[in-house]
Amino acid sequence: MWRPAGIELPRWDLAVTPTVIISSALATRDFQDVHHDRDAAVRRGSRDIFLNILATTGFVQRYVTDWAGPAAVLRGIEIRLGAPCHPGDTLTFTGYAHGDEVAVAGRTATGEHVSGTVRVTS
């Protein structure tokens, strides 16, 4: 066990802006128009552009590694997406470490955007 069981991670509030959504989509080479073109996203039934799965995964990993420190190694991640995350949302991450696993949830005002488990060792 790399950390004592039963540790609640500090909350992290991420202000989601159009720049966050567009730049993370471009950084992950996701050129789907729903991540950078509001009109295209609306035509497809969304209220606005939205965060892609690779960005969400990266933010989950960042949340855990910011807490665990530079010696931590992520050994696995399993996530499930829920409600979309749009510009203007605050994506609030919470987590709970038990053994070598961290349960993570990311919520917006409209509901749970992501939930999952990250396996960590040091």
Model-derived segments and spans:
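Catalytic strand-loop segment that frames the active site of acyl-thioester-processing enzymes
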Residues: 1-49
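HotDog/MaoC-like acyl-thioester-processing domains
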Residues: 1-12, 85-122
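A sequence-composition feature that detects small, non-aromatic residues
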Residues: 5, 15, 25-27, 40-41, ...
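Hydrophobic beta-strand-centered segment that forms part of the acyl-chain substrate-binding groove
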Residues: 43-51, 55-99
